[in-house]
Amino acid sequence: MKLLAVRRLLRIQSVVVRYRLDDLLFDQPLLPWWLRALGYLLPWRWLPRRRSEQPRAVRLRLALQDLGPIFIKFGQILSTRRDLLPEDIADELTWLQDRVPPFNPQQSVALIEEQLGARVDEAFARFDSEPLASASVAQVHAAQLKTGEEVVVKVVRPGLKAVIRQDLAWLYLFARLAERASTEARRLHLVDVVSDYEKTIYDELDLLREAANASQLKRNFEGSPLLYVPQIYWDWCRPKVLVMERIYGVPVTDLAALVDQGTDLKLLAERGVEIFFTQVFRDSFFHADMHPGNIFVSTRQPWDPQYIAIDCGIVGSLTPQDQDYLARNLLAFFKRDYRKVAQLHIDSGWVPADTQVNEFEAAIRTVCEPIFEKPLKDISFGQLLLRLFQTARRFNMEVQPQLVLLQKTLLNIEGLGRQLYPELDLWTTAKPFLERWMRKRMSPKAMLDNLQGQLEQLPHLAQMTRTALEDISRPAWDTRKRERHDHHLLRLLGAALLAGGVLLALQTPPTSANAWPSWLMLASGLYLLVGRRRLSD
């Protein structure tokens, strides 16, 4: 084992002892009873405790901060997994600050010049060596292009990949050991949690990916009064350097400044909710890191306020099927139709097909009824989704990364909205949007567009069906995947019948006595594509 890795392990161990995290580690059901009992023999467990010792959640947060940027980022990711963590720990981890000392400006300049293949004074009319901000992954410098535009230059912290690889190796080791020793750890899929983190952190290291995300989000809201996204200057973007328009706005948490400029806080809060649902249901592409540090408010027209979003390193998206099931789930909640909520979870494949609907419905009712007894303005949309996911986990709900990101984003938007306007009624804002979206989705135009999309797949239908059948026949194919493929095969069959019916109808007059096969194929195809879904409602 390399000396640096050993030193890092000793460093982690010393932090665990200093912050008495043995309480958190050895008192949890993640470890078997014999290992928890062994933990009580550790010498420092018998040392007297200070009266002023802080709660376990605070100690964990301080320890993660002490261990450095990679563990800070991991803690931030963990804070979104409220289905895994006790509430006090999840709440405390949201306070983790991703602020670290800046690295040497000379290193920053050298990296920029290496990436751009040009000297800084050749690329920019002005470059401020003193950074505007510094975080665990990158730091930001102000600059001006030769053409006069004010920009910011984001630079990835040098040497970060080596640190990430080392810390990830230890995180994977700890997660695997816990899963081998404990059924509870296996249920929580700790290795998968680390794997999700690995993907997130490496995605954030690729600034071209972040630039592409920002460009997509800007295009989605081009000309919108709701949201402004700074322009990306692609000629100066590289994997480790991003150049974008410099924005000037009021931090969304600076309520005093927003009030001073006469901002309509109620409208601002409602627009935050509208932005969220527009991203999720209209665009199926949402900014998944909308914490207050990444959101500003334009100083123009405070009576008609506009958000400004930066840092698009983490984004999420939903498939059309996930969009549909999510919208119908939320509308069923509005009606307190818990049986429909339970059935939708089964139909979507989020929980196993053999789940007892009656038992699942009863569990959902037990969680939701106390919440719905509150006034609508006091109900937390994000907390409701969280409680639902926690309940579904008891019924072996498979972790859906896209839904975890969505729930985290919703909690951020909802919390932000109620800081701006405590009387915000998120339900009143959301329900009309969802109903409009569902009506539009079931409109003749939408069905025609869907038919066109299915017809475009017709030349590939035979190969797609063959591939699906080969996959489903594999011994390792699990039940959940089999259910999803069954659903996919039925849609393929529906598309084939619909396309065949259309082609047959073009050759046979619809009033002819020989037209019945085309009508039968059209009706069967429509049933498989649309009717089955509506019947499940």
UniProtKB/Swiss-Prot annotation:
It is found in: Cell inner membrane. One of its GO terms (cellular component) is plasma membrane. GO terms for molecular function: ATP binding; protein kinase activity. It comes from the Bacteria. The active site is at 289 (proton acceptor). Keywords: ATP-binding, Cell inner membrane, Cell membrane, Kinase, Membrane, Nucleotide-binding, Transferase, Transmembrane, Transmembrane helix, Ubiquinone biosynthesis. ATP binds at residues 132-140, 154. Its main location: membrane. GO terms for biological process: regulation of ubiquinone biosynthetic process; ubiquinone biosynthetic process. Pathway: Cofactor biosynthesis; ubiquinone biosynthesis [regulation]. It holds the Pfam family ABC1. Residues 126-490 form the Protein kinase domain. Its EC number is 2.7.-.-. Coiled coil: none annotated. It is an enzyme of class 2 (transferase). It is a multi-pass membrane protein. The chain crosses the membrane at residues 30-47, 489-507, 513-530. Is probably a protein kinase regulator of UbiI activity which is involved in aerobic coenzyme Q (ubiquinone) biosynthesis. Belongs to the ABC1 family. UbiB subfamily. This is Probable protein kinase UbiB.
